From Swiss-Prot:
Subunit structure: Binds DNA as a dimer.
Domain HTH araC/xylS-type, first and last residues per copy: 174-272
Alphabetized PROSITE patterns for the sequence: HTH_ARAC_FAMILY_1, HTH_ARAC_FAMILY_2
Keywords carried by this UniProt record: Activator, Cytoplasm, DNA-binding, Repeat, Rhamnose metabolism, Transcription, Transcription regulation
DNA-binding region coordinates: 191-212, 239-262
Protein name listed in UniProt: HTH-type transcriptional activator RhaS
Length: 278
């Protein structure tokens, strides 16, 4: 597995934070690093496999990667990211207690992926721009200024995440997408889902297309197919059983959609024939 080292990314041995734009982010094999990373998805979509679990990411997704996590990107579609790298909680001179603003693992579950609305994403871009222009001076005021900007970023992400329970249409769509991540295998009636999240059906279609470039049904199908591919690689369930487990009522239809999405059949994935290009 590829290991990325801080010496190759941080401007100096003492700098606690670095900015790495990926515009766009190409598919990248599984790797980990000796630093922490906040991945901010600017726009378009891709698959983020985080510690072996696949997530569909799109504009507004924020992922918190720790120094022992492993991850990769695949099936990227002009996916644009900004990576905010930081060494460790004890690398800062003026900041303490950062853990209170970061996702925390509880009972083996780590809530690594958050979503923020487009207004917050614009504020994030502005803050990151200030961080990029803050210079690399090592005198106390310069260091303190950079660390304050990083703290402001964490506060903004925390306040803007789903945990804060915002109620505008943008936030409702984020909540809907998080719901789909957990309920993808269920039969989905879009009229009922729109009503559940207090959105009109037209608004749901328009906003999801703006966020992901996909219609609601296409987004749901992709989510199901990603989960199915994970099961094909990491379980002993039959192709038919996996199709049903992931919300497809017909295994032949599932196989057709799967090949169209990934250019491999479910059986190819089960037999590892795609491994040569991973």
């Amino acid at each position: 597995m590829t290991v990325l080292h801080s010496v190759d990314f941080f401007p100096s041995g003492k700098a606690p934070v670095a900015i790495e734009p990926r515009l766009p982010q190409a598919a990248f094999p599984e790797h980990h690093h000796d630093f922490h990373e906040i991945v901010i998805v600017e726009h378009c979509t891709g698959i983020h496999v985080f510690n072996g679990q696949p997530y569909t990411i799109s504009g507004g997704t924020v992922c918190f990667v720790r120094d022992h996590d492993r991850h990769l990107y695949e099936h990227t579609d002009n996916l644009c990211l900004t990576n905010v790298l930081w060494r460790s909680p004890d690398a800062f001179q003026f900041l303490a207690g950062l853990e209170q603003l970061l996702p925390q693992e509880q009972d083996g579950y780590y809530p690594s992926h958050w979503r923020v609305n487009q207004s917050a994403l614009q504020q994030v871009r502005q803050l990151v721009g200030l961080m990029e222009r803050a210079g690399d001076g090592m005198d106390a005021p310069a260091v303190a200024n950079r660390e304050i900007l990083f703290m402001q970023l964490l506060v903004l992400l925390r306040r803007s995440s789903l945990m804060e329970g915002a109620t505008n249409n943008d936030a409702k769509l984020n909540q809907l997408m998080a719901w789909l991540e957990d309920h993808f295998a269920e039969e989905v009636c879009w009229e009922a889902v729109a009503e559940q999240f207090s959105l009109s059906l037209r608004t749901l279609h328009r906003q999801l297309k703006q966020h992901t470039g996909l219609t609601p049904q296409r987004y749901l199908n992709r989510l199901r197919l990603i989960k199915a591919r994970h099961l094909l690689r990491h379980s002993d369930h039959s192709v038919t059983e996996i199709a049903y487990r992931c919300g497809f009522g017909d295994s032949n239809h599932f196989s057709t959609l799967f090949r169209r999405e990934f250019n491999w059949s479910p059986r190819d994935i089960r037999q590892g024939r795609d491994a040569i290009i991973q």
